[in-house]
Amino acid sequence: MKEAFFKSNFWIGLLAFSVAFPIFVVGSSWLLPGSELWLHFAQTLLPELITSTLILLLGVGAGVSILGTVLAYLVVMVEFPGRSWLEWALFLPFGIPAYVLAFVYLGVFDYSGYAQVWLREYLGIPGFDIRSGHWAIILTFILVFYPYVYMMARASFKRQKVQMIEAGKMLGAKPIRVFWQISVPLARPAIAAGLLVTLMETLADFGVVSLFNYSTFTTAIYSAWGDFRSIEVAAQLASLLVLVSFFLIYFERKARGKAKYYSSDVSHLKAYYAKGVVGWIIFFFVFGIFMLSFAMPLLQILIWSLEVFSTEWSKRYFNYFSSSGILTFLATVLTV
């Protein structure tokens, strides 16, 4: 018994050390003497990094919270055409990495992409730079990461107390009022958990922000290390990123408090039946999100793949597939 206890403690300690060691390393960078490069970053780039990162987090956070919660409520609480298969289809964007979705939308909606070409030639709409501003990158992150909030909110809605929902219905509350005043407050802990994961993913992303030429802490860390060859400044910037991550975790725990994610009441709620036009409007909304976040990008990837494979297929693609498969398998085994 003691031997098993010590073995389990050893592996837990090893895991904790593996997580804590990189944090300790980047934190210890502040003990090093200051450099002119850090002063340059702090005076010229740091305010821009903080502003752009904050705008990105606020935009993505608000977007995934609203979209993920609304989608979860619709598939759980409302009966509409296509509900049964759309409920699981909304998880499929998990299978497309964020940078891949960004690459697809840049290829389609960039100035030379066929979407802008069609808009200019047939509708006379002038060209625009999809990389300018914040809206395009925020929408990309929302389409990629909304499943985190959707997954958590959906599970919460399925386990909410039937008595409270039914009481609201009996008192004559309309579905939208039940949603805002009963269902959403009860699901707040789950929504906060999904939001936390989303913000952490957004904060750590490098591929999407690089494709959009958007300045965040991750691009600054890479620039400090790769362009300026300064590991010290890169570590100091990374420590600020870790500090923001700790703040997000603390904020999520405070927002959740001691609230429960689910109720022990497992009675099934009776879904609202959306009749006629309303049901089809809901269907096209949910289906549209599925198309934008998964089906259309996947179709575009397949089209590009077939074009490439038909002209330059070679054995190196088998190496790419095998390497990806091995890494996926090993990561899955180690994680589980």
Predicted segments with their positions:
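Membrane-water interface segments at the C-terminal ends of transmembrane alpha-helices
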Residues: 2-33, 44-158, 186-206, 234-253, ...
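Peri-membrane helix termini and adjoining interfacial loops of integral membrane proteins
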Residues: 27-38, 110-123, 212-218, 258-267
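Short hydrophobic, aromatic-rich alpha-helical segments embedded in or entering the lipid bilayer
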Residues: 36, 213-224, 300-304, 316
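Juxtamembrane helix-boundary/capping and inter-helix hinge elements in multi-pass membrane proteins
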Residues: 78-82, 158-163, 173-176, 227-231
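Glycine-rich helix-loop "coupling/hinge" segments at transmembrane-helix boundaries
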Residues: 107, 203-229
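Feature of multi-pass inner-membrane transport and sensor proteins
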Residues: 161-162, 177, 214-218, 247-281, ...
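Glycine/proline-centered hinge or cleavage motifs at structural transition points of membrane proteins
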Residues: 171-172, 185
